[in-house]
Structures are given as structure tokens and as C-alpha cells.
Swiss-Prot record:
One of its GO terms (biological process) is translation. Keywords: Ribonucleoprotein, Ribosomal protein. It comes from the Bacteria. GO terms for cellular component: cytosolic large ribosomal subunit. One of its GO terms (molecular function) is structural constituent of ribosome. This is Large ribosomal subunit protein bL28. Belongs to the bacterial ribosomal protein bL28 family. It holds the Pfam family Ribosomal_L28.
Length: 96
């Protein structure tokens, strides 16, 4: 399981710890990932996703999982989230 957010694409970054004496040692910046269960209103199902805290706030800000996925670009979504987005689009096209 990679340390990458399934909705926002946030991943591990690398950089330096810099001491007061300006010595640099390598370090990793890990994303704040949470295992959450989100509900799709269009599909009427629950989905367990590994999401960063930043993406979770964005989902709530957009009004839920469905509006967030429909607004999100395909490049930043994982393959599971992209399949979910396509399924939501298909259900909404049939309902319209």
C-alpha cells in the first residue's frame, strides 16, 4: 500500500532537516493519511478510501464525495477513485 492519497494525489516528499548550525540531514515528509469510509449518494454505497486530511476537508467543503469527484481532475485521482467517478457519471447520465 503506497503512501498516496487516493483523492488528492498527495504523496511522500523529501527534503532536509536544517539544524541551528545549518547542517542538513535528509528526511521525508509523510502525508497525513486516514482510512475513511465515504458514502456516495448517487450509488447509495459506502467506500473505504485512504485519504489525506486535506482531501477529507475538501470533500466536506464540496458537499460530499460525489460533487468532489465530479469536480476533480482525472490526473490526481487514483485508479479506484477514477472508476468510482465514472460510475457516478454513468448513474447521473441515466437519471437525467
Amino acid at each position: 500500500m503506497s503512501r498516496r492519497c487516493e483523492l488528492s494525489g498527495k504523496a511522500v516528499m523529501s527534503g532536509n532537516n536544517v539544524s541551528h548550525a545549518n547542517r542538513k540531514t535528509r528526511r521525508r515528509f509523510l502525508p497525513n493519511l486516514c482510512q475513511v469510509t465515504l458514502i456516495s449518494d448517487a450509488l447509495g454505497r459506502q467506500f473505504s478510501l485512504r485519504v489525506s486530511a486535506h482531501a477529507l476537508r475538501s470533500v466536506e467543503h464540496n458537499g460530499g464525495l460525489d460533487p468532489f469527484l465530479l469536480k476533480a481532475s482525472d490526473a490526481q485521482l487514483s485508479s479506484r477513485a477514477l472508476k468510482l467517478k465514472r460510475a457516478i457519471e454513468k448513474v447521473q447520465a441515466v437519471a437525467a
